[in-house]
Amino acid sequence: MLSELTFEQAHAAFLQKHLESRTGERRGRLERGHREAEKLFCRKVWWEVHGNFEHLHPEYEVMDWRGLSYFCDFVWIHGPVKLVIEIKGFGPHVKDMDRQKYCNELNRETFLTAMGYQVICFAYDDVANGRNCALPCCGWC
C-alpha cells in the first residue's frame, strides 16, 4: 500500500506541476485528456520502470504539418532523445476508425518520426492487464 500511496502522491505532483505551467487549450487538454488509460500507463508501466516522472510530459503539444495542434499522450525528452508514447484503445484506434482516420493516424506518426521523435504505442488492453509492455526493454528509457 505504501508504494501505491507513493505513486499517487508523485502522480498528483506530476500533474500539478504541468497544470501550473500551462494555460488555455494546453491546460484544458491536460485536464480533459489525462484519464484512465494515461494514469494506468503511469502506474503500471512508467512508474514500475522509473519510479519517477522526470522528463515525462503528459498531453504534449506538437504542431503538425498543417499547422494544427496534435497532443501526444506523453513525450519523454531527455538529452537528444524525444520519445512519443501513445496508449491506444481498440475502440477509437481500430473499431471506430474509418479509412481517412486510419490514414491520418499513420501520417501523424510518420510526421512525428520525420520531426525527430521516436514513436512507440501501447495497446490499452496490455497496459490495463499488465502484459507485454516492452518499455523495460527500451535501453534509452
Where are these regions (language model features)?
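Short, charged, amphipathic alpha-helix that recurs within catalytic cores of restriction-modification
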Residues: 99-111
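Short beta-strand-loop-alpha-helix junction that forms the active-site gateway
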Residues: 75-102
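Basic, glycine-rich
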Residues: 1-10, 18-19, 113-141
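Short strand-loop junctions, especially beta-strand C-caps/beta-turns
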Residues: 61, 88-90, 122-127
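Active-site metal-binding core of divalent-cation-utilizing nuclease and nuclease-like domains
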Residues: 54-84
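Solvent-exposed, charged helical/coil patches
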Residues: 1-51
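Short helix-loop-beta junction
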Residues: 48-53, 110-117
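Amphipathic coiled-coil/heptad-repeat helices and related helical stalk/stem segments
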Residues: 38, 67-70, 104-105
